[in-house]
Amino acid sequence: MVEVRVPATSANIGPGFDCLGVAVNIYNKFFVEEIEDGLIFEGCADKFKNENNLIYVAMKKCFDKIGYKPTGLRIKIESDIPVSRGLGSSAACVVGGIVSANELAGGALNKKELLDLAVEVEGHPDNVNPAFCGGMTASISDNREVIYSKVKVSEGIKFCALIPDFTLSTEKARAVLPKSIDYKDGIFNVGRTALMISALNNGDFHLIKYACKDKLHQDYRAKLIENFYSIKKQCEKLNSLGVFLSGAGPTIMVMLREEDKDFSKNIKSFLETLKNKWEVRELKIDKLGTVVNNRKL
């Protein structure tokens, strides 16, 4: 049996649209074994127990590339990453599927080949890359090849995810984005993405509040998330370092100083006054990324 653990991820990190992402310590686990015949799923809803399951789709993509044909598969899923909340649940399934398939097939593909294949299936590297590598990454796709660099994050920072009880599909969140942008808005984001990376590198955490600003996606998507701006404003009142939409949303991610002990309690009290229910989860950066049979990929 192959056991694969994949972390949740938070993409964009404010201005780094489709290129910045960070792995955090929420996990999905996948237990996969080859059986004599059939396709058996455990740990997911009945509607996902078929060949359209994203984990199986990713596995088949890997098997086809390698030229391996399993006799049958049993796939058990232990999922802690909330679905359609902007925390990389689909990326985790894709990565988990591809990595487990590669292990079953004898490890024919190297890490670079696995990463490129996962991005081909998922479509964007911003979640897939940190899910593979752990930590924070800056990544691009160039002629179907994934190019990335790890972003050093200085000690002394943590994250807090505000996770609502409603979902938001990536398709719907992308549909509200404009077909084109103003040149000045592109410059706005380029500068703040550079500032974000530099501030995290150097521990200049007081600059994050400026670096979190964005003109490419957050304001368009905010209208799909009830009370986004009031929550953001309250987070800022509670001395957060920065607030941004996690991936396509609807989860709101907050950056905090490590020593901040009061934020979670205080923001939870505020969120309880709102219509929807919100879960508050303090998180750390996951530095390992994908783990296969208790070893780092």
Curated annotation (Swiss-Prot):
Instruction: Say yes or no: keyword Chloroplast present.
Output: no
Q: Which reaction does it catalyse?
A: L-homoserine + ATP = O-phospho-L-homoserine + ADP + H(+)
**One GO molecular-function entry:** ATP binding
Q: In which pathway does it act?
A: Amino-acid biosynthesis; L-threonine biosynthesis; L-threonine from L-aspartate: step 4/5
UniProt-listed Enzyme Commission number(s)? 2.7.1.39
Q: Name one GO biological process term.
A: threonine biosynthetic process
The UniProt entry's GO CC annotations, sorted and at most eight, read: cytoplasm
Q: What is its main location?
A: cytoplasm
Question: Which residues hold ATP?
Answer: 82-92
**InterPro entries noted in UniProt:** GHMP_kinase_C_dom (IPR013750), GHMP_kinase_C_sf (IPR036554), GHMP_kinase_N_dom (IPR006204), GHMP_knse_ATP-bd_CS (IPR006203), Homoserine_kinase (IPR000870), Ribosomal_Su5_D2-typ_SF (IPR020568), Ribsml_uS5_D2-typ_fold_subgr (IPR014721)
Could you list this entry's UniProt keywords, alphabetically sorted: Amino-acid biosynthesis, ATP-binding, Cytoplasm, Kinase, Nucleotide-binding, Threonine biosynthesis, Transferase
Family matches, as SUPFAM superfamilies: GHMP Kinase, C-terminal domain, Ribosomal protein S5 domain 2-like
Instruction: Tell where it localizes.
Output: Cytoplasm
HAMAP family (alphabetical): Homoser_kinase
Q: What does the UniProt record say this protein does?
A: Catalyzes the ATP-dependent phosphorylation of L-homoserine to L-homoserine phosphate.
Give the protein family.
Belongs to the GHMP kinase family. Homoserine kinase subfamily.
| NCBIfam families per UniProt | PRK01212.1-4, thrB
| Protein name (database record) | Homoserine kinase
